[in-house]
Amino acid sequence: GADAKEIAFDQKSRAALQAGVEKLANAVGVTLGPRGRNVVLDEYGNPKVVNDGVTIARAIELANPMENAGAALIREVASKTNDSAGDGTTTACVLAREIIKLGILSVTSGANPVSLKKGIDKTVQGLIEELERKARPVKGSGDIKAVASISAGNDELIGAMIADAIDKVGPDGVLSIESSSSFETTVDVEEGMEIDRGYISPQFVTNLEKSIVEFENARVLITDQKITSIKEIIPLLEQTTQLRCPLFIVAEDITGEALATLVVNKLRGIINVAAIKAPSFGERRKAVLQDIAIVTGAEYLAKDLGLLVENATVDQLGTARKITIHQTTTTLIADAASKDEIQARVAQLKKELSETDSIYDSEKLAERIAKLSGGVAVIKVGATTETELEDRQLRIEDAKNATFAAIEEGIVPGGGAAYVHLSTYVPAIKETIEDHDERLGADIIQKALQAPASLIANNAGVEGEVVIEKIKESEWEMGYNAMTDKYENLIESGVIDPAKVTRCALQNAASVSGMVLTTQAIVVEKPKPKPKVAEPAEGQLSV
């Protein structure tokens, strides 16, 4: 049956939630800004030094279950922001903490939580429209380098590297990050492509921490057939199991018994396998599958040619040096051997492009040419120690995400300045709101927007209030640079954030805070006394 639950209402529930929110946001908040500190996580006895908000948030569990519910909400803010923008997680946590703190004060003094939430949402919506008007497009690799350096925690080297990688593969190219066997960090362009499909089942995941599938030197099966029964795939599975290498399947779909068989064999460790659905639709799907076949050197098993999956042999499989499958995309890095074929294919597509009249076709052809010829910029991350490697990989990951976000939606001044400037637009939005409590929601956002800049200043040992006042009086691009302790044009001095990151952090903070404020009750497991467990002797299996 269900375990005993503990229920708390109103004031008590919100106070406990808030305590959890504060604890977690404060632990994450110390890393904000160029003068932010690192946090040491002691996981399974090997300490890691981390400067990445979402990684810290994920590592914290609070002992009190009510407080942990609050912490879980901040974790949610960090994760959501990480998923949508890939960076800005710390900022989002700090914003959420402020909105929740101010919101709870208002609710305690009698404001209606639902109206507050409405006011918060209306204000944020208005500010995001303002942000879109203010964001300016990325110009050249100087901007890219600046965005990447800041996201990597003010690391110029990483910034230069990302800018270099994007120069090589273009803004539509693919960046892949792996660990290097040496101490050097390098950028190489390799043949490969990105496919807009993710794994069919999360059971295929090999890296649980990042929920991705990672294969090295995999064999590749490509078909436009639906695989449903066991008998279709058993012959192939038996052959590939003997090769002892991972198998990657691209098919119209895999369902029923066939999928169950793959998952069971994967979980039992008999064969490392993963599958994605074929990208695109109709005629174009065929074309894209042929492209993937060429990149991997596989034979495309087309059902109209009678090439059935159940008759497939190992010789018809392609190979890929590295495959990374995310929830919605897959990156494929080819064996060096398929280079000539890829180039021939690109030449053929360019010829088709010059001959077509259809705008739609030419767009799609151009996209395929870009995917095939752009290749994949592989950043091989080197470091002297495991701890340093992990920290550097997280920083490069952040920098990569921030850079693509900047290319997508433009850039704004960093250092929390964009939020402070946005706060000056709140009164105008508030004018359009009638309801008294909704207007309080607008006030809450106006105050909360100052928190990130204030914390960046405090982390640098400077009085936050003073900084905020100064930024407010200045132009949009001006702000406080905590690195140099000067007020200056942040865009010119390269302190810039992607508008997308600024937007997502605010939206996610507001959305989760709205949930907290409209919470009347929390139900959590009653903490049970932990039974004492006898430790197994060294070297013995614990059963």
UniProtKB/Swiss-Prot annotation:
Misc: This protein shows ATPase activity.
Regions that span the bilayer: none
Keywords in alphabetical order: ATP-binding, Chaperone, Chloroplast, Nucleotide-binding, Plastid, Transit peptide
Function: This protein binds RuBisCO small and large subunits and is implicated in the assembly of the enzyme oligomer.
SUPFAM superfamilies, sorted: GroEL apical domain-like, GroEL equatorial domain-like, GroEL-intermediate domain like
Main location per the UniProt record: plastid
Subcellular location: Plastid, Chloroplast
HAMAP family linked to this entry: CH60 (MF_00600)
Assembly and oligomerization: Oligomer of probably six alpha and six beta subunits.
Transit peptide, residues from-to: 1-2
Pfam families: Cpn60_TCP1
UniProt GO cellular component terms: chloroplast
Full protein name: RuBisCO large subunit-binding protein subunit alpha, chloroplastic
One MF annotation (Gene Ontology) recorded for this entry: ATP binding
PROSITE patterns per UniProt: CHAPERONINS_CPN60
GO biological process, one term: protein refolding
Entries under InterPro entries matching the protein: Chaperonin_Cpn60_CS, Cpn60/GroEL, Cpn60/GroEL/TCP-1, GroEL-like_apical_dom_sf, GROEL-like_equatorial_sf, TCP-1-like_intermed_sf
The keyword ATP-binding belongs to this UniProt entry's keyword annotation: yes
UniProt similarity note: Belongs to the chaperonin (HSP60) family.
